């Protein structure tokens, strides 16, 4: 079992939004719950990422490594799966936190995996070809009868 927290858009004032204090309480409770309930399959490092989410999509490993497409299979959703102008400082996406935990892990005990990822991303950007346009929906999804 995994948990996500609500991710608002910038400027939102909604009852689902957690205050910084409520967010820290949620992190503390998830840390306690994972010890009591083994089916809560969230490592401590992942849960702790909720305390320090990325500040912007350019810092989010999940946003940098995925391409989201809307239900019409044509429209790209940017900058991440939430689209629009997400308030990354209040991100509650479990996938973002999981990849953030991987990036924070130290390979060999001293090299942050995130540094390797960023170097790889830069090399890929330098060598990248322009992205191919998405095929028409009927070419991508064939309905069998």
Where does each model-flagged region fall?
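Flexible mid-to-C-terminal extensions adjoining Fe-S/redox cofactors in radical SAM and related proteins
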Residues: 57-61, 68-145
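Radical SAM enzyme [4Fe-4S]-AdoMet core and its adjacent flexible, acidic
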Residues: 1-62, 72, 104-108
């Amino acid at each position: 079992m995994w948990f996500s927290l609500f991710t608002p858009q910038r400027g939102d004032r909604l009852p689902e939004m957690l205050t910084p204090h409520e967010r820290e309480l949620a992190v503390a409770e998830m840390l306690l719950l994972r010890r009591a309930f083994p089916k809560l399959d969230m490592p401590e490092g992942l849960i702790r990422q909720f305390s320090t989410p990325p500040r912007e999509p350019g810092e989010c490993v999940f946003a940098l490594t995925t391409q989201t497409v809307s239900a019409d299979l044509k429209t790209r959703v940017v900058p991440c799966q939430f689209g629009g102008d997400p308030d990354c400082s209040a991100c509650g996406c479990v996938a973002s936190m999981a990849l953030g935990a991987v990036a924070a892990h130290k390979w060999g005990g001293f090299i942050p995996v995130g540094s390797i990822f960023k170097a790889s991303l830069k090399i890929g950007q330098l060598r990248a070809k322009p992205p191919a346009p998405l095929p028409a929906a009927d070419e991508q999804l064939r309905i069998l009868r």
